[in-house]
């Protein structure tokens, strides 16, 4: 049996050279491939997307404590890019702490500090992870006259002070929807491999040397899960 559709989990691959090799293989085999960063499927983000004025930049900020920055940055990058519509971004690591810590998952690493992503259309994503954080984690999205706060874990979106309740999504509830979309339409709402791989490569090409330098490693791969 030949494979028609493939959905890969993030973080895609730890080595930069893997991305082009896999891309060639998928094209050679004719396999349509997406990457499972599912916020694009969330009702809350679809609602926020409907409020975005596409001609104006998106300013997206998320701050939390111990939320697994290395592991989960790509999720925020993916939805940020979906909201602002740009094709690529610049990634700044100047405000990261010069320390690499062990991840909760054995054999992997984590970082703290602030990551900043900017696009040619003036959009900015700021992600902050601090051990001292004791507030309520939320995404703050500014665009035009709108200030939007999204409390993902509570299913609450506040737009200019007005509360809207949205479903809290779990992967168990999204997998069936995703399969139905693929079988019925031959496509889905996730980023395709080419899009997501470009985000992964842009992130990994900065974060891998940063981590390897601090750890004194000479490997070309980086243990991000």
Annotate the PLM regions:
Residues 105-110, 116-182, 187-194:
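NAD(P)-dinucleotide binding in Rossmann-like oxidoreductases
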Residues 1-40:
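Beta-strand-loop-alpha-helix segment that lines the small-molecule cofactor/substrate pocket
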């Amino acid at each position: 049996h030949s494979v028609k559709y493939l959905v890969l989990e993030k973080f895609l691959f730890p080595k930069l050279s893997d991305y082009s090799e896999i891309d060639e293989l998928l094209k050679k085999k004719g396999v349509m491939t997406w990457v499972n960063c599912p916020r694009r499927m969330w009702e809350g983000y679809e609602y926020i997307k409907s409020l975005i004025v596409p001609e104006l930049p998106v300013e997206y900020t998320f701050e939390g404590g111990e939320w697994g920055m290395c592991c989960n940055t790509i999720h925020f990058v993916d939805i940020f890019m979906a909201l602002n519509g740009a094709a690529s971004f610049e990634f700044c690591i100047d405000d990261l702490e010069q320390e690499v810590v062990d991840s909760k998952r054995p054999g992997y690493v984590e970082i703290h500090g602030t990551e900043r992503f900017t696009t040619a259309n003036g959009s900015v994503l700021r992600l902050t992870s601090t051990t001292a954080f004791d507030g309520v984690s939320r995404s703050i999205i500014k665009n035009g006259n709108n200030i939007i706060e999204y409390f993902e874990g509570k299913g609450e979106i506040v737009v200019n002070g007005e509360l809207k309740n949205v479903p809290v999504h779990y992967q168990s509830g999204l997998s069936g929807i995703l399969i139905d979309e693929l079988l019925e339409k031959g496509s889905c709402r996730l980023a395709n491999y080419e899009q997501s791989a470009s985000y992964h490569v842009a992130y990994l090409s900065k974060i891998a040397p940063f981590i390897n330098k601090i750890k004194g490693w000479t490997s070309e791969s980086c243990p991000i899960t």
